[in-house]
Amino acid sequence: SHGEASAEELADLAAPRLDALLAQGVTTVEVKSGYGLSLEHELAQLEAVALLGERRPARLVATCLAAHIVPDEHKERRGDYVRLVTDVILPAVAARGLASAADVFCDEGAFTLAEAREILEAAARLGLRTRVHGEQLTATGVATLAAELGAASVDHLEHVDAAGIAAMARAGTVAVLLPGATTFLADPALPPVKALRAAGVPMAVATDANPGSSPTTHLWLMAQLACVSYGLMPHEALRAVTVVGARALGLADAGVGRIVVGGAADLVATDAPGWRHLLYGLGDNPARRVWIGGREL
């Protein structure tokens, strides 16, 4: 129908963004749905990810974020939309093999803690890995819930409390830091990196690439800003965009994000004079040559 993009059109629109990531040596990319908010449109977005995966050598991980916000037509009967997600959208996605994970945005203006639990439990029953966007705008306690339910990661975390940090540390839940969002939204609240570090919570960094709050595909800049704005140390930032990112996606055991015998052999060559320089020049893309699975792009 008019004004609605097909999976083919969505894949065409996404291709230049994926190419920008590949040019930086980003070989593994998570792509989320969440801008459809109906069965038909969520499936189209995830089908676009599958199409992209056929057209590009990148390793793509599809996540269904149907639980992004409650669409306007369901505002009066929120439970109806939660049930649409748990009983219709997620089962259809799982049955078609279109996503390996499900994500929920639990925050003010999005889903409540109780709704998040319903959606995460439904996803887990379907065999989907789970992740959460949360503690971004307000402290909800969803970090504790995510850890309890075995979610792979919690994104944002500007307002996570001590209990949430402790729970994530115990469960090994990855904290995904998103400096693009705090920068673009001019949010004075920053994630408590010192407390996360002290507790031993693994920290990843991502672009949060999206039109509303983080319009960027520059993962190097995000790693650089994580050092400048969030106080990560250079070695932490490098791990954050390699092995810890792979861990958040459930790929670390497959040797993604690391140079190991029998691993993925995704390699990036740079002419930077030393590894710290990778995190120094704001906006620099230090990648000069890129290999995925041992094959040069």
Question: For the regions a protein language model found, what residue spans apply to each?
Answer:
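Non-catalytic positions within long, well-ordered alpha-helices that form the structural scaffold/packing
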Residues: 22, 86, 94-95, 124, ...
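Active-site-adjacent C-terminal substructures of enzyme catalytic domains
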Residues: 129-130, 139-258, 272, 282
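Flexible loop residues that form catalytic
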Residues: 34, 107, 157-159, 267, ...
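Metal-coordinating catalytic core of metallo-dependent amide/deamination hydrolases
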Residues: 1-14, 19-20, 27-141
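Short coil/turn connectors at secondary-structure junctions
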Residues: 24-27, 55-60, 96-98, 171-172, ...
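C-terminal cap of metal-dependent C-N hydrolases
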Residues: 241-243, 261-297
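Divalent metal-coordination and catalytic microenvironments
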Residues: 25, 32, 102, 133, ...
